[in-house]
Each structure stands twice: as C-alpha cells, then as structure tokens.
C-alpha cells in the first residue's frame, strides 16, 4: 500500500486565493471546528494565522491548523488569502452572549463601575439588582459579582481571558437555549450591546453533516475545500466522515473534502475493509481526499 499523504502536502493543493476566472470564486479553505468560540450559524473569515491565534488563542487547535494552512507549501510564491471557520457542534450547545473586549480597562476603572443589567435567556427576562464592582479583585471575580446580582439567574457569567470579554452562557442546551444582548445602565461600559461589538450564539442541537453543509453554502460558497479540525467520529468508525463525503459527492465536484483519518488498519491489513479509504472506494464517492494523522 502506498504511504499516506501528510498534512503538509494537503496545504500545497490549496495554495490560497487564486481567481477561478469570471466573478470571483476564491480557493479558500473552510475549517470546521468543534469548539464553541465561533458563534453558531456564522462563518468567520481570517486573513492570517496571527488573526486566528488572536481570536481562538495561541495554543488552540484552530491556531495550530491555521499556522500550517497559511504557511503554504515549501517555496510557494502564492499564499492563502483567507481561512474560513465555522462551528460544527458535535453535541447540543448552549446559547451565549460574549461581550466585546474590556481588557483595556484597568482594574481600578472596572472597580469604578456600577449599574444594572437586563438580559433575556431562554425566553425569560432577568433584571439585576445594582451591580457594584468596587470590591472586584479581578475580572473573573467581577463576573462572579455580576452573576450574584441576579436573583435565580438561568445563566452563568464568566470572564474569557482570550477575548478579554464577559460571557453570559445559558444553563440549557439545544434549540430552546436562547439569549439576547444586554441592556441596562451598565451594558455599555461592559461592552455587552450589539453596538459595542458583542456577539450572540444561539443554542443548537447536535449538527448533522449534510444539513450542516447545506446551511453553510447558504451563508457563503466562497471556498473550495473543507476539513475538520477534529475527527468527527472521535476515533470510532467512519459514520460521520462518510456522511460528509456523501454530501460532497452530490455537489458536482465543486468542493474537496479533506478527511482527517486516524485509522491505522490499512497499514497492517490489506484490504482493511472497515477503513474509510476502502469504504469510499467501494461506493465510488468523488471529491474526498484522505489525510492520515496518528491518533
């Protein structure tokens, strides 16, 4: 059996933004991540690996993948122009409100803030008592104080050091988990309004490959290949990877699915009848390329 294609080789076949002629389809890559930082139902675009690291964190899986992606192949003279990222939730997820960054505030400035917040979570409006942050010892402690100002909150409040923002997360998951932006006299100072740059992500049930990918094409089709930053089947079988491949097979060879596979059985057994490559070959699925990565 021939050797598997390394991940670095994959990047060489997605060299970046090269006009396909006519009106502007770019050969961008689309990364599906199972992290919740990307809001549900959105596709984010990043122009550099540094931008990905800033958004997701320097040690994140997304940043690691982006560093390889944007580097291109050895001696390449054309680099990728953008990396698109969407959240593929592998389980039911909760709604959240993530404010814009407040990291420019000093602790003393944070301690000077006082006021109220109003937020609707899971259809129930909650109004805080007066929030006084004079006793806050840190931004994380301020989040605890904010949550405590609500009577029986149906959400938790935390401080996210990566984005430098306060995050309100519903206590429920799934489609009924919903959240709004904050109002109230303290909402502006804490950057919890849409006008301040805050974002919301509504709850969702576990994603299904075909339905999910069709929804993505309804948001944008400005990409040529897609891959996951994780094994969709979590190292057990190929059900979801096959579902992605089967969806892609119906797209008229418009996209390439770069499937990450951790199954080492083809290196020891020929034919490896349960392996993804064997199953794809037997079904004559088009448009899928496999990358072996040890688990």
What are these model-derived regions, one by one?
Residues 1-111, 158:
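Extended assembly-interface regions of large multimeric machines
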Residues 11, 82-83, 155-159, 174-202:
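Generic structural motif
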Residues 26-28, 165, 221-225:
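Short, surface-exposed beta-edge/turn micro-motifs
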Residues 48-57, 106-184, 226, 231, ...:
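Extended, beta-strand-rich, solvent-exposed assembly scaffolds of outer structural proteins
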Residues 70, 151, 212:
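Phosphate-interacting basic helix/loop segments used at nucleotide- and nucleic-acid interfaces
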Residues 82-91, 160-167, 260-264:
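Short, glycine/charge-rich beta-strand/loop segments that flank catalytic centers
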Residues 93-127, 131, 140-148, 182-219, ...:
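Bacterial flagellar/type III secretion structural subunits and associated motility module proteins
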Residues 148, 218-295:
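A glycine- and small-residue-enriched flexible loop/hinge signal that marks low-structured segments
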């Amino acid at each position: 059996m021939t050797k598997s294609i390394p991940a670095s080789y994959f990047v060489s076949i997605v060299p970046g933004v090269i006009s396909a002629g006519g009106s502007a389809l770019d050969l961008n890559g689309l990364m599906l991540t199972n992290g919740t930082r990307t809001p549900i139902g959105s596709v984010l675009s990043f122009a550099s690996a540094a931008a990905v690291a800033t958004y997701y964190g320097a040690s994140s899986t997304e940043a690691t993948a982006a560093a390889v992606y944007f580097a291109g192949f050895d001696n390449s003279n054309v680099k990728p122009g953008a990396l698109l990222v969407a959240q593929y939730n592998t389980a039911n997820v909760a709604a959240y409100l993530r404010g814009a960054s407040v990291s420019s505030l000093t602790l003393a400035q944070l301690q000077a803030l006082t006021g109220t917040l109003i937020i609707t979570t899971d259809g129930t409006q909650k109004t805080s008592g007066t929030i006084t942050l004079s006793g806050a010892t840190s931004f994380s402690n301020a989040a605890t104080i904010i949550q405590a100002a609500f009577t029986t909150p149906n959400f938790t409040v935390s401080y996210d050091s990566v984005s430098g923002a306060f995050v309100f997360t519903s206590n429920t998951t799934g489609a009924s988990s919903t959240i709004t932006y904050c109002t109230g006299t303290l909402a502006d100072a804490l950057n919890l309004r849409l006008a301040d740059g805050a974002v919301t992500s509504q709850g969702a049930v576990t994603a299904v490959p075909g339905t999910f990918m069709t929804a993505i094409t309804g948001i944008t089709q400005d990409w040529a290949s897609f891959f996951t930053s994780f094994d969709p089947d979590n190292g057990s079988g190929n059900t979801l990877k096959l579902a992605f491949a089967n969806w892609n097979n119906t797209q008229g060879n418009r996209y390439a699915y770069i499937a990450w596979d951790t199954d080492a059985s083809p290196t020891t057994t020929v034919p490896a009848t349960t392996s993804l490559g064997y199953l794809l070959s037997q079904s004559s699925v088009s448009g899928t390329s496999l990358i072996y990565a040890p688990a």
